[in-house]
Regions:
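A short helix-loop-beta-strand connector motif used in the catalytic cores of GNAT acetyltransferases and
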Residues: 57-71, 88-92, 122
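Conserved acetyl-CoA-binding loop-helix of GNAT-fold acetyltransferases
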Residues: 134-147, 169-173
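Conserved N-terminal entry element of GNAT/NAT acetyltransferase domains
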Residues: 1-20, 40, 195
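Conserved beta-strand in the GNAT
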Residues: 71, 77-86, 122, 127
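Conserved GNAT acetyl-CoA-binding A-motif
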Residues: 119-121, 133, 149-161
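Conserved acyl-donor/pantetheine-binding loop and adjacent beta-alpha core of acyl/acetyltransferases
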Residues: 86-125
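Conserved GNAT-fold acetyl-CoA-binding loop/helix
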Residues: 34-57, 67-68, 102-104
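Conserved acyl-CoA
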Residues: 111-116, 129, 140-155
Length: 195
């Protein structure tokens, strides 16, 4: 992995998200959580989840804010997204986020471990449209996030589902190593760190 992030590889480019990307970000966050599949029609319940998340994405001071997202485009069409943020405001942002979403009760949230903490750049969500997987987009997004963390002099962290060995292999190829477990959203995730 190089010290400098790639700004354009082959035919894909990177850009910061805007509030106008709310629908795209909502879909890709939900895809990262395996709630929807990007190449399949959405059920009514899945569409309701997207619709509920969109206004949250348009805000600042929440976990899934457009301000935390970087989008990859191919021929001006968005095809991938990585959402990351510094960990110091995690609890405040989580509370503000889930007060607006019908996904979890306060008791469920209180029983979850913190996904991140101060001194970290937490990679919350990463999703690539299935048509564009396997061509290096996810790796480039991860490299850019690691570069950002290094520029801030903090570690990059993420969680991976133990039932997703392909994702874990990608993260390990990018230099992430396992450091414990985190219980969140009903899953005992592996916590991976890049220092």
């Amino acid at each position: 992995m190089s010290d400098q992030p790639l700004t354009s590889v082959l035919e894909f480019t990177f850009r910061a998200a805007t509030p106008d990307d709310a629908s795209f970000i909502a879909r890709y966050v939900l895809a990262a959580f395996h709630i929807i599949e990007l190449d399949k029609p959405f059920s009514e319940e899945q569409q309701q989840s997207i619709t509920a998340l969109e206004p949250v994405v348009q805000q600042e001071g929440v976990l899934y804010s457009y301000r935390h997202a970087e989008i990859v485009e191919i021929k001006r069409e968005p095809v991938a997204m990585l959402l990351s943020y510094k960990g110091e405001n995690f609890r405040e942002f989580r509370a503000r986020t889930f007060q607006q979403l019908p996904f979890f009760t306060e008791e469920e949230l209180a029983s979850m471990d913190d996904e991140t903490q101060a001194g970290e750049l937490y990679i919350d969500s990463l999703a690539v449209h299935p048509q564009h997987r396997g061509c290096g987009i996810a790796q480039c997004l991860l490299e850019r996030a690691v570069h950002r963390a290094k520029s801030l002099d903090i570690a990059a962290t993420l969680l991976v589902d133990p039932e997703n060995p392909k994702a874990r292999a990608l993260y390990e190829r990018c230099g992430f190593t396992a450091e414990g477990r985190v219980n969140a959203f009903g899953v005992n995730f592996h916590r991976l760190v890049h220092r």
